[in-house]
From Swiss-Prot:
Gene3D superfamilies: Umud Fragment, subunit A (2.10.109.10). The gene is lepB. It comes from Rickettsia akari (strain Hartford). This is Signal peptidase I. Belongs to the peptidase S26 family. The lineage of its organism: Bacteria, Pseudomonadati, Pseudomonadota, Alphaproteobacteria, Rickettsiales. Disulfide bonds: none annotated. Residues 42-266 are periplasmic. Keywords: Cell inner membrane, Cell membrane, Hydrolase, Membrane, Transmembrane, Transmembrane helix. The chain crosses the membrane at residues 21-41. The active site is at S45, K108. Its main location: membrane.
Length: 266
């Protein structure tokens, strides 16, 4: 027979468990909103630095906070501009909302700062009329068999990274047209971005344009998981998900897990 004391203890235990769960959920939400957020990359515009279906760890605090960087609050105009703002650095890989489509997120490399003059001539970046250091270091063949020339580029602040250009035969097939551009003058408060996959990136050279600082969400840091194929898809049934589990596991790119996005020691 259950006594009143037993019932009271049971109720207390249930309440304690509920409050513990609520506390854990609140902490997780705060971390997601203020500290870090994972992102999945759906396109190859940053190939081969970042591949399709790479899962990226990014830090929210790197540039401070704006309406667009605070998860779950980006639809509420809490304030203008950024709070606790920290200036981005040339060469950062940034997650942001493109001004021409605020419903999606892009990830690109920051090349031009406010006040900069940017131009590409024969695939070489010129910043304020000075070309950056660019050296061909090898080739890269993607998982779908497309071959790229691989270059090591050094920005004026000393930041180095790899960029990729379609090999000549593929350049003809995919209509390479981004290697020579007009001159871009970066306005105050805005930034110029490029994809590391230079011939296959929708960036500031084409439709994207300049990106306001307010649109920055986070700074990408490293890859925490990576697969060649997606397992989850809202358009397929449960049985198909079960059938896709084995090939999905086999498609995990173990060599990319915990890869630092700023490491050029290859």
């Amino acid at each position: 027979m259950q006594t009143d004391n037993t019932k009271s203890n049971t109720n207390k235990t249930a309440k304690q468990e509920w409050w513990s769960c609520a506390f854990v959920i609140c902490i997780a939400l705060l971390i997601r909103i203020l500290i870090m957020e994972p992102f999945t990359v759906p396109t190859g515009s940053m190939k081969a630095t970042i591949l399709e279906n790479d899962y990226i760890f990014s830090t929210k605090y790197s540039y401070g906070y704006s309406n667009y960087s605070l998860s779950f609050f980006d639809f509420i105009p809490l304030f203008k501009g950024r709070i606790f703002a920290r200036e981005p650095e040339r060469g950062d890989i940034v997650v942001f909302r493109p001004p021409n489509d605020m419903n999606v997120r892009y990830i690109k490399r920051l090349i031009g700062l406010p006040g900069d003059k940017i131009q590409l001539i024969d695939d070489v970046i010129y910043i304020n009329d000075k070309k950056i250091e660019r050296t061909e270091v090898g080739t890269y063949t993607s998982e779908d068999g497309i071959k790229y020339l691989k270059f090591k580029e050094t920005l004026p602040n000393g930041r180095t990274y790899f960029s990729y250009k379609l090999a000549p035969i593929f350049s003809v097939i995919y209509n390479d047209r981004y290697g020579n551009t007009d001159v871009f003058y970066v306005p105050e408060g805005k930034y110029f971005f490029l994809g590391d996959n230079r011939d296959q990136s929708n960036d500031s050279r084409v439709n994207l344009g300049f990106v306001p600082f307010e649109n920055f969400i986070a700074k990408a840091q490293f890859i925490w998981f990576s697969t060649k194929i997606n397992w989850w898809d809202n358009d397929i049934g449960v049985m198909n998900l079960v059938l896709r589990l084995k090939p999905w596991i086999e498609s995990v790119r173990l060599n990319r897990i915990f890869r630092n996005l700023y490491n050029t020691d290859e």
